[in-house]
């Protein structure tokens, strides 16, 4: 199974340009910035020394640092993941002045904001907040990180889409694809038909005309991987439940993991397992 973490998604490629990110910024914060040159993309791409990779991050005038993640399966652990990302971004930001961190001079930092754009099948919510404190074993307000989750499903956050063309167009693209899949088209058929539909209706037109083969590859892989992962998880759970024990359920998932049919990252991303269950699954 290919590793989605080392591949970009259509969302990241399309949304992650300076001009589109400026539109997202203005729509979310209700501002009116017009100069895309003020946007500095800071996305963590991973390297030989660090495998930390996020979807999109950028700064505007070095005042605001916005971190954006795209998900088709909502992950309740996003606050702690984003905490790791912003930690790495701050380390890189202060690198030129790192000696000052031990001085009496205060190092000024861009204010971070955290967003997830959800693109899955759950239409029960429009906007929700995920809080780092929800994961604490005992109540505490000493450290907090709030992630704002926006649902891109049809009929959700239409006011936001109305004022943000990139999000509106991506939502049309994605939701049309999902509609075709529900009608029985294969992944490849649905991707190709969606591209044609969007080009004909001037949706993501320029991007799709210049990147059609890449989009077919990326979007097809993204949704194939998602559907395969969910099917494997459901199959593993069914095997465990048939035994009538939670132990059997976890052992079945562990078998899938050891056989290379699912990854620990995929299990974490599914949001179906507690940290304790993941630790039990990971045991050899």
Language-model regions, residue ranges each:
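Elongated, amphipathic alpha-helical interaction scaffolds
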Residues: 1-284
């Amino acid at each position: 199974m290919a590793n989605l973490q080392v591949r970009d998604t259509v969302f990241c490629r399309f949304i992650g340009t300076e001009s589109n990110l400026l539109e997202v910024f203005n729509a979310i914060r209700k501002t009116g910035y017009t100069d895309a040159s003020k946007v500095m993309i800071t996305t963590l791409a991973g390297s030989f020394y660090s495998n930390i990779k996020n979807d999109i991050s950028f700064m505007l005038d070095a005042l605001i640092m916005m971190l954006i993640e795209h998900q088709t399966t909502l992950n309740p652990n996003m606050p702690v993941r984003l905490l790791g990302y912003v930690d790495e971004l701050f380390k890189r930001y202060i690198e030129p002045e790192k000696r000052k961190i031990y001085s009496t001079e205060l190092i000024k930092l861009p204010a971070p904001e955290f967003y997830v754009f959800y693109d899955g099948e759950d239409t029960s919510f429009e906007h929700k907040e995920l809080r780092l404190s929800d994961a604490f074993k005992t109540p505490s307000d000493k450290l907090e990180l709030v992630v704002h989750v926006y649902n891109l499903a049809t009929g959700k956050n239409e006011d936001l889409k109305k004022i943000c063309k990139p999000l509106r167009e991506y939502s049309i693209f994605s939701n049309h694809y999902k509609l075709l899949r529900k009608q029985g088209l294969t992944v490849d058929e649905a991707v190709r038909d969606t591209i044609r539909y969007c080009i004909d209706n001037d949706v993501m037109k320029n991007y799709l005309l210049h990147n059609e083969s890449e989009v077919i590859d990326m979007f097809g892989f993204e949704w194939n991987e998602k559907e395969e992962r969910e099917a494997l998880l459901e199959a593993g759970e069914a095997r465990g439940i048939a035994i009538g024990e939670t132990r059997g359920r976890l052992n079945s998932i562990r078998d899938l993991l050891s056989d290379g049919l699912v990854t620990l990252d995929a299990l974490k991303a599914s949001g179906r397992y507690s940290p304790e269950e993941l630790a039990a699954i990971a045991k050899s």
